[in-house]
Structure formats: C-alpha cells, structure tokens
Regions:
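Phosphate-binding site recognition
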Residues: 1-330, 334-335
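A cross-kingdom feature that marks ATP-driven nucleic-acid transaction machinery
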Residues: 297-448
C-alpha cells in the first residue's frame, strides 16, 4: 500500500528512536489502516529488523524468524545453524540489536503470541535484565489480544511500554486526498461507503465513480471487500453469529440496548456484554449527550457503528447476500442502495461536519471549539453542539445533506430547540446550518 499522510505517527516513531533510554512502543489498530506501511517506512530509515509474525506452529515460526535474522544481519551462519528454541533466538536478537543499534519491529505480534505461548514472557525477562538502549515496536491488528496480552494489567509486558500509538482511520479531509479530482459529493460518497481506511480508498479510487467501486468491490461475490467484515469479526470472536446480528441491527438504525436486543434476537440480559466487546474492538461507539456530567454512568447512551464501511456492509450486504451470490449486485445497487442514498448519507454528512468544525472551527464559527458533541433528550435532538467552556460560548448546528434546504426554517426550529436546553443558561449562543445549498444567510455554512 502507498504510504500516505501518516506524518505525525512517523514523527512520533522517529522521536522515540532518538531517546537515550530503552523504548518499548506499542502500535495497534484494526486491519488495513496502514500500520505495516508506516512501520516499513520507519524501518527503511533506521535499518531496522522487521519481522512479520506468521500464523503457524512455534517451530515453523522459529525457522521464519531465524531466516529473517540471517538476511537482515547478513549472517550466513544463521542459515545453517539452528537455535534450540525461542529463548536463545531472542537472546541473540537482543544482543545484536544493542551492539548495532538496530530497532526491532514485530508486526502482527498477536499471531506470535498465539503461535508461541510464553514468547511475551521471554521478551519481558530479556527487557527487564537489559539496561542498555534498545528500541522495540510491537504492532497488532487483533485489538482484543493487544489490549489483553500486551497492555492488560495481567500481561507480562504490562507497565513496560514507553509509547502507545493507536492508528485510527483517516478523517474525511485526509482520505479525500485519494480522490483529488473528484467532486465534493463523490468524495463524501466514497467516505460514506469505505470510511477512512486507506487500503479501501486506494483500491476504490481506481474506479470511475463511487457506485462503480461498490458494485465491483462489495456488491460482488468475488469483490475484494465482499467478505472483509467476516474476517474482521471472526478473527477476534468465537461466536460471530450473535455479533453479526447486533451489527446488522446497528446498521439498520437501532441505537439503544433494548432496541438492539429485540431486533437482533440476543437476550436482553446479555446485550451489554456483547456491546462492551464490540466497543473494545473499536467496531462500535458509545455516545452520550454532550451535557452529561458523568458519561460512564449515563442512562442516555446510544450505540453506533464506528466504521462507515461496516455500516454500509451490514445495512445492504449482510441481509442480501443471496441476491449478490446470484450475480444481481447491480440490481441491489439500483433498487436498494441508490434510493436509500439520502437517508444513508445523513449521518455521514453529520460526521463530515463534525470533523470540519473540529479542524476549522475558528474559521467557520469565529472561535476555537474546546468540545464537540451531540445533544438529545426525550423531546429534541441537535446534530452538533460546539462548546467553549472557558468563555461560556456555545454553537448549535444542524447538518443537512440534501441540496435543497430551507435554511431559515431549519434555523428557526434550531433556535427553539436550543432554548429548551437549560445547561447553557447564561451562555452566549449561536445557531448554524451546514448544508450543500448556497445561500447568503450569515448563519449558514456552505460545505460542498
């Protein structure tokens, strides 16, 4: 994959490599976000040892490991001799790294933990007894394993990391760089269908339009992303069936635990356990109104899919796989996806507006946001609320994807709703509409 716009992450890696003390850097994030590409670019400039951990037996993994060391360190003897076990191999690696000042990178470290039980304990002992400078990067896509076996309080390596880097999807602004000659609408559609995953965007950008890309890549039994969500979920979970049903319910618009349980068929008594697991995997988000004083204990929490591609897949592909496998992806596109476009894109546009306010808030509303969220109660919902708690200023924002928007009508309704929120009594209030319509209203922000 092409290295693209991970400047801050690369800077952090380079800075940690210049530290005088030993460094253990943990890098994690879901599949296809460019972690390996980032680390390979870092490795190039540092002449680092890079080991891509295989899914295999301990003995086979050791053979791969020894071969990799022989090539990286230009030691022909390593190709002939065999280490008795992982303890000896890792001891040699540590000694060579310290002598030559070579950073060590273990990509997909969870696979090594699964293939070689106790390898994390070996690394821990070697780390603890060494007081010389060494740089180790442990990277993984299996978020549950990274959190439990590397970062968890019962993990052998707990408390030893110097840095934690969570690699996140690109924002709309950054992922749009993959589509430099496209219209705003097409960029938004691509973001809505493929999210901020650079590997998806790189492939999608090779097609002429967003609709062509989803038809070829997703709504096609042989498409490169047709089975992608199954890999994501099955790789980490033992009972994927219930989780698939929950993800489908979320993609269909169910947001509250009781709604999700009823729609998915998962017992109400167990739904929170499933939701917590999906949240730890960073597949879903738990959101509360911006005004909540104790978010963790809030009873107003909503759950939403954290990934646009998963939202598309579980909304359109999961319930219609039989249609796709009959070769009727084009019909699915014309009869279900396109007619549903404005409904599907509403939350996507809201997400884009949120990111735009976070990035360019001062330019758009005149001051720097300190906090951005949503508001809802039993009576009203407001798409975006922007706070400056220091100056007690607040901006209420409605986001409208449609091209024809009666801005004055939306603003009047927004002002009435904002007056009902008592949390901002005495604050300076502003109301805005963000849309793709063009108007001279000073409280309208054009995005398009």
């Amino acid at each position: 994959m092409t290295f693209f716009n991970r400047i801050q992450e690369l800077k952090l890696l380079n800075e940690s490599a210049t530290e005088k003390d030993k460094q253990l850097v943990v890098i994690f994030g879901r599949r296809r976000l460019g972690k390996t590409t980032l680390l390979r670019n870092f490795a190039k400039t540092k002449d680092a040892f890079f080991f891509s951990c295989p899914i295999s037996t301990a003995s086979e993994a050791l053979r791969h490991f020894q071969q990799q060391m022989a090539d990286a360190f230009d030691e022909p003897i390593l190709k002939k001799a065999e280490f008795p076990g992982w303890q000896e191999a890792l001891e040699y690696l540590f000694e060579t790294s310290i002598q030559r000042n070579i950073p060590l990178i273990f990509d997909e470290f969870p696979y090594l933990i699964k293939s070689v039980p106790g390898v994390d304990t070996i690394i821990k002992h070697l780390w603890d007894k060494n007081d010389k400078k060494i740089w180790i990067g442990l990277c993984g896509s299996l978020i549950s394993v990274m959190q439990e076996k590397v970062l968890g309080k019962d993990a052998p390596l707990y408390g030893r990391r110097s840095e934690i880097m969570q690699i996140k999807p690109f924002t709309f602004h950054d992922i749009s760089l993959f589509y430099p000659n496209s219209t705003f609408e097409d960029k938004a559609l691509w973001f809505g269908y493929f999210g901020g995953v650079p590997a998806y965007a790189e492939k999608a950008s090779s097609y002429g339009s967003p609709f062509e890309s989803i038809e070829k890549m997703i709504l096609n039994e042989n498409g490169v992303l047709y089975q992608e969500p199954e890999f994501l979920v099955r790789e980490e979970l033992r009972e994927p069936g219930a989780y698939f049903s929950i993800l489908h319910s979320l993609a269909s618009g169910k947001t509250r635990p009781n709604e999700i349980a009823q729609d998915s068929g998962v017992p109400h008594s167990g739904i929170n356990k499933y939701l917590d697991t999906l949240k730890r995997m960073q597949l879903i988000e738990r959101r509360v109104p911006i005004t909540e004083k104790n978010p963790e204990r809030s009873t107003k929490a909503l759950y939403l899919l954290a990934d646009n591609f998963l939202r598309f897949w579980f909304r359109y592909v999961f319930p219609n796989r039989s249609i796709i496998e009959l070769g009727r992806g084009r019909q699915l596109l014309e009869r279900f996806v396109k007619p549903d476009l404005d409904i599907f894109m509403g939350p996507i546009f809201e997400q884009i507006c949120h990111q735009e306010l976070n990035k360019n808030g001062k330019k758009l509303i005149g001051w720097e946001p300190l906090k951005i969220g949503r508001y809802w109660d039993r009576q009203i919902e407001i798409d975006i609320v922007v706070e400056d708690t220091l100056s007690q200023r607040v901006a209420f924002v409605e986001c409208k994807w449609g091209k024809r928007v009666n801005v004055n009508k939306v603003l009047n309704g927004l002002r009435k709703k904002s007056d009902l929120i008592t949390s901002y009594a005495g604050w300076k209030k502003q109301c805005y509409v963000i849309s793709r319509s063009k108007t001279s209203n000073p409280n309208h922000i054009f995005l398009g």
